[in-house]
Curated annotation (Swiss-Prot):
Molecular function terms, GO-annotated: haptoglobin binding; heme binding; hemoglobin alpha binding; metal ion binding; organic acid binding; oxygen binding; oxygen carrier activity; peroxidase activity
Protein name, entry field: Hemoglobin subunit beta
Family membership: Belongs to the globin family.
Domain of life: Eukaryota
The protein's role, per its UniProt record: Involved in oxygen transport from the lung to the various peripheral tissues.
Positions of post-translational Phosphoserine modification: 44
Globin domain mapped to chain residues: 2-146
Chain sites annotated for binding heme b: 63, 92
Membrane-spanning intervals of the chain: none
Residues where S-nitrosocysteine is found: 93
PROSITE patterns cross-referenced by the UniProt entry: GLOBIN
Tissue: Red blood cells.
Keywords for the protein's UniProt record, in alphabetical order: Acetylation, Heme, Iron, Metal-binding, Oxygen transport, Phosphoprotein, S-nitrosylation, Transport
């Protein structure tokens, strides 16, 4: 696998304390605020007119929760990310035509949200491990492009 045993345990220890529903909504919401061009994939989600509207939007929260539950699933199959995300890759890439760059952006936003939530607990080694994970997941999701 691409993570050492040590990194896996850092990732899993922190993840066991994550409120997946809450963090998912926050990460997706921040993606749409910070990188507004990503909003074009979410035009059916209703009011995205301001940061407050986005962060309070129930459809954004619901999809964020879905996204992070998939990510959680990926962590359980960390050595087979391509297999785990094959169907989602197909959906996002072939059917929805999402630019794979957006998966990287969301991964970076997720790292910011975790840092924000966990403060000092989100040490440099923990961040390093998470950066590897989000890059691995983004790659797996972009897989259908290669």
């Amino acid at each position: 696998g691409f993570l050492t045993a040590e990194e896996k345990s850092l990732v899993n220890d922190l993840w066991s304390k994550v409120n997946v529903d809450e963090v998912g909504g926050e990460a997706l919401g921040r993606l749409l605020v910070v990188y507004p061009w990503t909003q074009r994939f979410f035009q059916s989600f209703g009011d995205l007119s301001s940061a407050d509207a986005i962060m309070g939007n129930s459809k954004v929260k619901a999809h964020g929760k879905k996204v992070l539950n998939s990510f959680s699933d990926g962590l359980k199959h960390i050595d087979d990310l391509k297999g785990t995300f094959a169907k989602l890759s197909e959906l996002h890439c072939d059917k929805l035509h999402v630019d794979p760059e957006n998966f990287k952006l969301l991964g970076n936003v997720l790292v910011c949200v975790l840092a924000h939530h966990f403060g000092n607990e989100f040490t440099p080694p923990v961040q390093a491990a998470y950066q590897k994970v989000v890059a691995g997941v983004a790659n797996a999701l972009a897989h259908k492009y290669h």
